[in-house]
Each structure stands twice: as C-alpha cells, then as structure tokens.
C-alpha cells in the first residue's frame, strides 16, 4: 500500500504542527475505523482513529485501486483527535 495526498491542500504542517506523512504512522498500529456516511462524497471515505508516536490523530482517507493492483490510500485530512475520539480509540484497543 502506498499513501498520497494533494500537497496544495495539505496545510497541516503550518496549521497543526504535523504533516500528512507523519499522520500515515497511525496505520502502523491498531486503528478504529468507520465509514463517513454523513453525505455523498462520490467516494467511500473512512475516518480512522489511531496514534502516531505519542499523538492521537483522526485521519480521513479513501482507498483507490491502482492499475498495478496496489492500493493507494489517499489522505484527505488529518487532525489531532478530540477527547471523545481518544476515549473511543482507547476503549476499542484496550485489553479486557
């Protein structure tokens, strides 16, 4: 799997203190994911909660199949998770 994003729309480093490349680290561990069905985006968007180093992040992405069969995970947005999202991720990934 490879990652991509629109560099012109990525204001994350300046506005949020991290870039999309940093945000891809959440996929190295367990993520809590749900489909974003709030409206029709013309594509299947997924909201993923996870951790990159010591930071809880929420990343919105869509998967696109490449001609080679490889998956291109296109990052749409990334931000620090809010309290509710951090608690949901912790609950979902904690051992009983």
Predicted features by range, described:
Residues 1-96:
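Ribonuclease/tRNase effector modules and their secretory precursors
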């Amino acid at each position: 799997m490879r990652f991509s994003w629109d560099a012109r729309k990525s204001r994350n480093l300046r506005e949020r203190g991290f870039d999309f490349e940093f945000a891809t680290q959440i996929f190295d561990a367990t993520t809590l994911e749900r489909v974003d069905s709030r409206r029709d985006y013309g594509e299947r968007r997924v909201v993923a909660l996870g951790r990159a180093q010591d930071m809880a992040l929420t990343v919105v992405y869509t998967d696109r199949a490449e001609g080679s069969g490889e998956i291109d995970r296109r990052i749409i947005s990334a931000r620090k998770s809010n309290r509710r999202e951090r608690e949901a991720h912790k609950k979902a990934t904690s051992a009983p």
